[in-house]
């Protein structure tokens, strides 16, 4: 049996990015043969990535990038908030955001196939899954290409906003982006609110108004009033400006001789059902997984 030295473990870790203990185990299994140990690790990390792929990713980060004429937001998901703070995970998210802005992929599949450091983006992702031990997924991205100005705002790493705007004052773009993160409008103007949201609000308003017992014509006016109130509340231009609620966003923009063309808002895990296991079930699952290895 060949002696496994610390320098051998360090060399294998540098080649594979695998955890120290995994490197030592692989070298021991390979009887000190570096090439064989590297192959064993790559197979093992690949298996690790495959096992992780079925697990829910409801945590993560939003990353942004703005270049000369394009900007992007990317949501990268993982399983725990601990990994969401990992330096390698965050560096990958920022790199992916830059790729979206500069390479203009059509969708996540096209993004995953882009070259990155001699591999594809997906191969780098899988290597990171193997290294960290959690499932990692690129959930979505948005890209704005324009000759206008772009502003981004990240609230921590869980909320991200990108805004396309015109105007001389850069602070206006930053303020609008921050406002979007705080107030979470669903559209630029009331005309842009999705029809399904309006219909849902109308049904709720009709049910409430019907309970009032008032005449039909009064009920109809109550419903219309509720819907109009809803449209103002969820459209950016009609919302009171978060830094000065005596002005709407539209009024603030007009006073600044500025205009917003569009915006996008990402909130990490929005719409993803996060699995809640009890402690006993979690322990049982870990024991079962250990028996299969």
Swiss-Prot record:
Keywords: Cytoplasm, Elongation factor, Protein biosynthesis. Disulfide bonds: none annotated. It comes from the Bacteria. Its main location: cytoplasm. GO terms for molecular function: translation elongation factor activity. It is found in: Cytoplasm. InterPro entries: EF-Ts_dimer_sf, Transl_elong_EFTs/EF1B, Transl_elong_EFTs/EF1B_dimer, Transl_elong_Ts_CS, UBA-like_sf. GO terms for cellular component: cytoplasm. Residues 80-83 are annotated as: Involved in Mg(2+) ion dislocation from EF-Tu. The keyword Membrane does not apply. It holds the Pfam family EF_TS. Belongs to the EF-Ts family. Associates with the EF-Tu.GDP complex and induces the exchange of GDP to GTP. It remains bound to the aminoacyl-tRNA.EF-Tu.GTP complex up to the GTP hydrolysis stage on the ribosome. This is Elongation factor Ts. It comes from Burkholderia thailandensis (strain ATCC 700388 / DSM 13276 / CCUG 48851 / CIP 106301 / E264).
